[in-house]
Amino acid sequence: MSNMLKFGIPKGSLENATVELFKKSGWQVSISSRSYFPGIDDSEMTCKLIRPQEMGRYVERATIDAGIAGRDWVSENQSDVVEVCEMVYSKVSRRPARWVLVANGDSNVKGPEDLAGATIATELVGFTKRYFSERNIPVNVEFSWGATEAKVVDGLCDAIVEVTETGSTIKANGLRIVCELMESVPVLIANKASWADPWKREKIEQIATLLKSSLAAENMVGLKMNAPGDKVEAITSVLPSLKNATVSHLYNSDWLSIESVMSEKEVRRVIPELIKLGAEGIIEYPLNKII
Amino acid sequence: MSNMLKFGIPKGSLENATVELFKKSGWQVSISSRSYFPGIDDSEMTCKLIRPQEMGRYVERATIDAGIAGRDWVSENQSDVVEVCEMVYSKVSRRPARWVLVANGDSNVKGPEDLAGATIATELVGFTKRYFSERNIPVNVEFSWGATEAKVVDGLCDAIVEVTETGSTIKANGLRIVCELMESVPVLIANKASWADPWKREKIEQIATLLKSSLAAENMVGLKMNAPGDKVEAITSVLPSLKNATVSHLYNSDWLSIESVMSEKEVRRVIPELIKLGAEGIIEYPLNKII
Amino acid sequence: MSNMLKFGIPKGSLENATVELFKKSGWQVSISSRSYFPGIDDSEMTCKLIRPQEMGRYVERATIDAGIAGRDWVSENQSDVVEVCEMVYSKVSRRPARWVLVANGDSNVKGPEDLAGATIATELVGFTKRYFSERNIPVNVEFSWGATEAKVVDGLCDAIVEVTETGSTIKANGLRIVCELMESVPVLIANKASWADPWKREKIEQIATLLKSSLAAENMVGLKMNAPGDKVEAITSVLPSLKNATVSHLYNSDWLSIESVMSEKEVRRVIPELIKLGAEGIIEYPLNKII
Amino acid sequence: MSNMLKFGIPKGSLENATVELFKKSGWQVSISSRSYFPGIDDSEMTCKLIRPQEMGRYVERATIDAGIAGRDWVSENQSDVVEVCEMVYSKVSRRPARWVLVANGDSNVKGPEDLAGATIATELVGFTKRYFSERNIPVNVEFSWGATEAKVVDGLCDAIVEVTETGSTIKANGLRIVCELMESVPVLIANKASWADPWKREKIEQIATLLKSSLAAENMVGLKMNAPGDKVEAITSVLPSLKNATVSHLYNSDWLSIESVMSEKEVRRVIPELIKLGAEGIIEYPLNKII
Amino acid sequence: MSNMLKFGIPKGSLENATVELFKKSGWQVSISSRSYFPGIDDSEMTCKLIRPQEMGRYVERATIDAGIAGRDWVSENQSDVVEVCEMVYSKVSRRPARWVLVANGDSNVKGPEDLAGATIATELVGFTKRYFSERNIPVNVEFSWGATEAKVVDGLCDAIVEVTETGSTIKANGLRIVCELMESVPVLIANKASWADPWKREKIEQIATLLKSSLAAENMVGLKMNAPGDKVEAITSVLPSLKNATVSHLYNSDWLSIESVMSEKEVRRVIPELIKLGAEGIIEYPLNKII
Amino acid sequence: MSNMLKFGIPKGSLENATVELFKKSGWQVSISSRSYFPGIDDSEMTCKLIRPQEMGRYVERATIDAGIAGRDWVSENQSDVVEVCEMVYSKVSRRPARWVLVANGDSNVKGPEDLAGATIATELVGFTKRYFSERNIPVNVEFSWGATEAKVVDGLCDAIVEVTETGSTIKANGLRIVCELMESVPVLIANKASWADPWKREKIEQIATLLKSSLAAENMVGLKMNAPGDKVEAITSVLPSLKNATVSHLYNSDWLSIESVMSEKEVRRVIPELIKLGAEGIIEYPLNKII
């Protein structure tokens, strides 16, 4: 169908964050437990919920035109697709996912080389095999159907390659990270033919722009204050240089209004300084998007 | 009691949305599971929780001065009240409620006329009787105590008249919408004597204005950007014409600040154009009310 | 450790509100069910979760430098600490906690003096003993391990001293408030030595300023509108005088933009007047902080 | 269809108890949230879930052959059906449902006669009208769509006729029972033609026998013990006379085994006496059915 | 370790049923959310929770001595293990799991042969490939990471091979079962060396006997009654012949006590007959095990 | 009041187990969230829900006649009451509660003597003070308001005295049990005057007998089988000697029926032997009470 873009929402751990991100970007995606088809309020798009593990396969095959999934799975399947951009979900709890090599807390494994001859369980069989084979370490890699951490706790294998954000589940199970093998962030990928189609490419780029504007606004706020004319320079100099402050005259007065955008963390530092410099009527307000 | 307005909050499907709407409009309504009386932080108002089916009855009788309920139930009871305004809860999931005629998916019913002699179950007995009688189709309409869809599935009746938003529950049960009989939206209704009392009328109008301002702001956002003076006209011409943009000078510069209000959907269209036209420092911020 | 502030988050009824308050103030505090240590995204701070009953003890002893707890418990333990400021969680549901003397609904107790010789159960044993002893009323005060209301219902004691916000639980149990003994609000307290240390004091004051800015913004909103030049005076005179309105020229026009901050309740009153005075394009937007 | 019985399970408050009762009686009824049709593992029966308010209507009309519903609703609708037997769900929490006349706790209503001219809200409009009309008390009875207790609390009506088991919800709302108007128990009802059909009647009677056997076994247990021959008479005389005890010889001994059935409450009384009389090896075991 | 049996509990859909089955058989298995190791109150056993998909692998490799898993997965992996016995979880809701070929409800697929050239998604890749290859039907079988039904709904593949008990989820999604490919029941499997070890084999057989005794007792009950001597033959002839009835003399009487075991369904048939034949004091009691 | 016994149910961790135990013993105790008074279906008893920490206080003072609480708390308060009997809740998960001395996992504390001068937090202040003072170890014991484990993790104190069943929470927090200070089981205690009153004492003893009979039946089952006359001696010799087996003649046969009571664990051992010895028709049935 021409002028219709088929987009893949990643099912599972990124699902809610992606729906929320679309919402902030102006699209209502509705996922119902009664239906596998997510709805979207854009007559030029349809959505499908797709496992991250399979996103690359379906984008490559043009079942969908574009979609979001972790780079780990896109590369695991060695899918032949276009990577449009990274989508760094920047909230504190959204550190990059790290694939790590994990052994029992009391084992003697110091590095990958200590695992020659061992059995390693993982969901990421292809990547793990390539990783050890590139280092000429002979290992037996086998597919794990989930609960992978339990396997090394239980002695069902010698080590695992598992994904983690903070490492806390691993520690809580008495396991130990031997080393990190790969970091992964979500990426927006597109089918090659779709990317070559001008209408589809513009649509994909529109989506990418708006999603990234919403991500950029996470943890960012607007700060607005009034200041006497002779303090404006001092005040603007303590504001973060991310964007130039917007300064405008006030009516019947030599005061000015100053407005700027910064992260919540910078606000913590800036406000005590602004007070000292004589800014008044300081207010902070929330932002939806920063372009 | 003079200078005290008694207001009816609709119990049930509109209850939470109404409480949230009052909150956005500046009133805290607190509904406790321990008490039937909702509290409200306005010394000139008291609230009662009332079933939509009975709202008209109690407003007509002056038990309460005004209230919100679906127009379907107000008209079912043919209550003699003033309809002050519609309250279109505009979120995507809040399409108008539709009362539809529903038959089994595999029945031969093509229209109301195919139901002559049939038994029809519904909660809206009065409306349904009037509908069929106006068309001279003899039917047996009987009151259904809920789970109305089950009745036609189970063969307990030939068809039903039931309310739906999206039709998905009906389809999921293997039923089929024959035709739509009525669309209904929530309305704010007032007792006739209360409406004639100047103080009460002003109070009711204040409530109506603020609730509508909050509804108008749903899915709307503010967009602010800086632009060189010679681009202002081009930029303002791509902004939706809902409200004129607010344009002001920036300090010590020939740039201007442009600020406008639009729906989230328009933002999707507008932002790529603004970037092309040279707007900078574009930010989007949320709104509570638009008057 | 120098340049490191140890801060106590109150466990229990104020816990979520405090974490949310820090979030609004620019700090992410993460409390995990797997760990007793809340994390905080500030390299100059560590947090501990501490019962309000024990906060004074640990601040006094310098186990932590500062913390938030109800003034009731700080004074119960007669802890020797600095009270930096009150933290009035101002939302409607956050009235000051009141410690009240409670008896059975049908008892004859009119005032504390009617309880001579009686047994009184309470969690606040020290305060209650001092209260009755100052009034020369001999009573037997005993520590209650919770479910204190049940004790007077059950006849296990003659009266209780219990904390309440609205009194509704007390009434629901058929009990009666005899009189109020003390009102309590949360306070930010600091260890005396920490307060004397310049770096720690500045850090504590930074926290206090930002938390109070966030509290000040609760239930407050920004209102922005355009007005013809000759209406500005009339319009600004109906705005609440909390902060001066910010007024600025519009481009190529004799209209002005007016912006002000007020409580949601004032908005209810002001908007009908602004409309009458000719204001246009009125929008209301949310605030995070007011300094 | 011949040799097929259509049976109505009451939807709502009796639903789970009825399904459990069928289970104890040897039938697996499966109610799925995905389907309106309950399944049953008996090739001679089909089930439907039907509101108690409508059970009489559908049995009378032969839509179903038989069903269980409260006698209150069967009589409200004055359905022309056969009442096969009462089904007294005997667990402690299953007291007969009582329809009571309820007024505000502080009203002066002493009896029905004090309500002349009043408005009474109830779900049981027909019964209530007949009740007051038989006593020549003119009242305005109106249908209540639920939350009936709230109506008298809220002053929407003068009194209500409502169903209750223990009266505790009524008391908790500050209301008062004026008097009881009717007691209701579940009944098994049958269509008149179905009852006249020999095969259907035998099937209905089989169901009635087994359901009643299961109900009879609720709170009943079996008690078994050994006793010397000369104590048998004394022991059997303290056992409840509900059923004769089963006494049998033991092998190579002059001891006897005694076995009897009684309620759990009688066990509390009997066991201390049995110990005194020299019974040994006393065990208590659970029962499923007593015929 | 000698005299220690390592046993695999299947994680997932059979997990709770298996724990409950061990409980009925006299073993307390405790699965904690804090630990991957289930505990068991038998000093001769340890347990591990293992995915059914991997059970065969770990039993074959002697990581565990024995375990329970569906025969589908044991055969998928072509594990070289001993199948000790079937474990037919006989409750109504536990029909054998069926692997079925599923296509869209409105497709033209009538049998496997209509799928030549198609893409089939399944978790059971090995079995599916063998199935089609034995029939010389060329298909592309690909591994599905779950939500397999969604794939055919969504058009991501042409057909799926999926497991189902009742087919109701398939129907609810608008899909259609083309044909059944395999039925699967849980089996108890053992490692070959463990089975050759006399102590381990005896232990495995003890477990098998007790688990099967508990399964045999599901839906079975004991029935006990008294009867006059001349009715015993008639009565015992209507009892199911599963086990001989136990008949014993009553003390000082020519009545006899008759006791037998049967399924709950047979009780429905038998009780009306027993009453007609003069049996008295009929009671039904629950059973834990039948050997 | 004469002939009325006031009984205390322990609120909290033993609450549900106690209510269930009373239910098995023939008393329905109903605890409602709307009321502090548990109901009981015995016209000679009333119940109160009381914290274990306060049970001794109220029994000593005759506010109640008897109650159940942990011996730890009865002795903490040094209440002057009669201990009627232990109530060993024997289910696997109900090991005796142990009060243990706990330090950080990596501390050097080997025994109580290493804590001279330390601060110890505990809910059991009196016992802990006595324990250390008897050993002449000077420590600072302070009352902990809950979350005691967090205190030693957080460094708020040097060690804690805390209750545990399995030690797993302690280990999960990285703490270490230094030694056990006391084991505690629930006890049934009585007021001294109540115990001296013949009617009350008999009532208390009746309760004690029935509760203990129910506890004795936990994890116990009945086993029944038929055997040829010449195998009876061999068979009864393998049965546990807890109670003599009940053996009776079968009608018109030289077989005998054998019935015995044993624990579920013994059944695991016994059944394979019974099969070898020729027993037939073995069934196992559940028990409610063993006296």
Curated annotation (Swiss-Prot), chains A, B, C, D, E, F:
Gene: hisG
Family recorded in the similarity comment: Belongs to the ATP phosphoribosyltransferase family. Long subfamily.
Name the record gives this protein: ATP phosphoribosyltransferase
GO MF term set: ATP binding; ATP phosphoribosyltransferase activity; magnesium ion binding
Organism listed in the record: Pelobacter propionicus (strain DSM 2379 / NBRC 103807 / OttBd1)
BP terms from Gene Ontology: L-histidine biosynthetic process
Subcellular location: Cytoplasm
Lineage: Bacteria, Pseudomonadati, Thermodesulfobacteriota, Desulfuromonadia, Desulfuromonadales
The keyword Ribonucleoprotein is annotated on this UniProt entry: no
Inhibition and activation profile: Feedback inhibited by histidine.
